[in-house]
Amino acid sequence: MSQRKNHRGQQKKAAASPSKSAASSQLQTLSEMFPAWEADELAALLSEHHDDVEIVIDLIVNNKVSKWEPIKKEPKPKKREEVITDSNATQTSHAHNDAKPKHSRERPKNEKRRERKPVQRKEPSAAVQAAQAASPAPAAAASTSSTSSASVPSNSWAAALSKDAKPKQKKEEPEVKEPAQEQEQPKEEQEPAVAAATAAAASAASAPQETQAAPAAPAAPVAPTTTTTNDHAEKPATTWASAIKPKAKPIKKKAPEHVPEEEVSEVVVVETEVSDVVLPQQVAEVGVSFGSLALETEDVPESQPEAQPKPEAQPESQPEPEVQPEAEPEIQQEPVQQEQVQPQQVQQQVQSQPEQPQQPVPVQTQEQPQQPQQPQQPQQPQQPQAQQPQQPQQPQQPQQPQQQPQQQGQQPPHFEKPAQGYDYYPQFQQTQQYQQAAGSVPGQYAYPSFDYSAAYGQLGQAGLGSVASPGYYPAAVNGAAKPAAPAPASAEIGQSPLVQPNNMGQQSMQSGQAQVPGAAPFGYPNYYNYFYNTPFYGNGGMAASTTSYGAQQQPQSQQAAGENAPASGEPETNGVPAQAQANNQYYAQYYGQPNQFGSRGGYPYSGYPASQPYPQSAGQEQPEGAQPSAPQGAPVPGVPSYPQQMPQYGAYQQFPQYGSYQDSNQYRGWY
């Protein structure tokens, strides 16, 4: 901001008029430091940053400013030189077309941005002529650079008309064939040349000088180009760009830098055959059809001879396939050799395998992949050998599958026993019985007014088989299904459908599996509880028994009891934080207690992380169900230890029934 204040303040004025000499010195330094930048751009940057060279350097070095910014770039000397040379060159250079590579005129395709400028720069031509008289050397240098980039701006319709109005199209037509060839080469040459020339000649005025001087000294030493940049700003006051520029620009240090480049590339380009090929193309781009027809007609014969050598190239390419078949037999021979080597290996393997029939099968299997490869190879007499060792190995491979079924036989008690079917009834009933035995359900949930165990969970024990049946509790069915699938073996080892485990065993199991808080109560999909069990529906969507109060929290309460009792298979840390979360979250949802995160708890999906730990903790506990003894780690941060079933997230939590409604925190999202 200090820059802006200064900018609005005195420094801008100082930079504007009194400091042009200072600005010019700064421009010199900048242009020397950044030869790729045109003086116009650097001047614009300086003026913008009130002639603070350090700021400009910082901007450029850190790429905070790019050359191609639209306004600053139009005054780019590259394109100015090209533009001016086009306006002047179209007038002067038709006589000098031979001295200039006309492919340089093709460049305007790339530089259509400059179409305006040739008109503007026809003015400086007078100034340019004066400048040429004043500085013939820079003009000569500019001529070299301009030849590479001179005629670009002929894109402008005015330039196109002025060029085409002249009857030099005929000259161009014979020349077209040459430049097409030249254009390809010199474009390559020109691009470096143009870059060097533009860097060296940082002002557009140099271009008109170049154009007129070009006939005189097309190959003149390049070094003076740097002086042309200075001359341009001072000499043609007619160009708007020159008026903008700070005038004192003795930037002559560039010359030694760019001279070798320009001499190499530009001199070559300048002295290449000259043709006005560009004009018709430019005209065609502009939409004027003068030279474009001639170009097309003449380019066609050029392209044809180009196309003709291609068939010549084809016969050349044809002998190559002949060579390839030669290479192919070599390749084939090589595999044969490999095969010869391999059969030996195979024989060795065959010998070693019967000798060592009891090697661990994986070792032999490693050998096998080689052998099947060998039968693929053409030498067939050796295939049987390769196959024979495979056969002895095969009887050994079945050993692995045998071992695997043994292992599986060990594992299925883990996985298959649950899969064989939990006794959903005894589990569910026992869990609820355990809750009753704990007598903790209402107290645990801190809702003394409502005894969930009596209302819901105990129906099954009351003898309503339907309630206790998995069919009655979709939660029970789903939960039972879940423990079968994800249930880790260790949790389920003690739980065979045949032998009903003691409550502790089932508690650990269910806490690990069906009770995954994420798997709402027995694996309800979470959305049941989210959508239908919200306090608005009063548990409504599901049967009351299946609500989180009934199905879900009953098992949780049993977990709570079991976890309170150290006898439960899982240490408290496993079940407690998850249950605490689940219960807290369910209560937050049902009684609208705000979540840890202040999201409105009473509404479905209200809390971002807090209400969705069901799935999270589900992911957590199921693996932990696999390792019931492994503590879950520090209790979930927001969730108090289990007996505080009412988490005290904030002071308001202590009156949960008011939470979602009176809590200002709940409504932050609403205003």
Curated annotation (Swiss-Prot):
Region Disordered, residue ranges: 1-27, 66-266, 294-439, 480-516, 546-577, 601-651
GO MF annotations in UniProt: DNA binding; ubiquitin binding
Domain CUE: residue ranges: 22-65
DNA repair as UniProt keyword: yes
Main location: cytoplasm
Places the protein is found: Cytoplasm; Nucleus; Chromosome, Telomere
Sequence ranges of Basic and acidic residues compositional bias: 66-83, 95-124, 163-190
Function according to Swiss-Prot or TrEMBL: Recruits the ubiquitination machinery to RNA polymerase II for polyubiquitination, removal and degradation, when the transcription-coupled repair (TCR) factor RAD26 fails to efficiently displace stalled RNA polymerase II. Also involved in telomere length regulation. Binds DNA.
PTMs per UniProt: Ubiquitinated. Proteolytically cleaved by the proteasome in response to transcription stress; the resulting N-terminal form constitutes the activated nuclear form and the C-terminal portion is degraded.
Gene Ontology annotations of biological process type: DNA repair
Protein's name in the database: RNA polymerase II degradation factor 1
Recorded name of the encoding gene: DEF1
Keywords carried by this UniProt record: Chromosome, Cytoplasm, DNA damage, DNA repair, DNA-binding, Nucleus, Telomere, Ubl conjugation, Ubl conjugation pathway
Low complexity composition-biased segments: 12-26, 125-160, 192-229, 302-322, 332-413, 422-436, 480-491, 502-513, 551-561, 602-617
Similarity remark: Belongs to the DEF1 family.
Assembly mode: Homodimer; may form higher order oligomers. Interacts with the large RNA polymerase II subunit RPO21; the interaction is direct and serves to bridge RPO21 to the Elongin complex in a manner dependent on transcription stress. Interacts with RAD26.
Compositional bias (Basic residues): 1-11
Assigned GO CC terms: chromosome, telomeric region; cytoplasm; nucleus
Bias kind Polar residues: ranges: 85-94
Pfam family, one: CUE
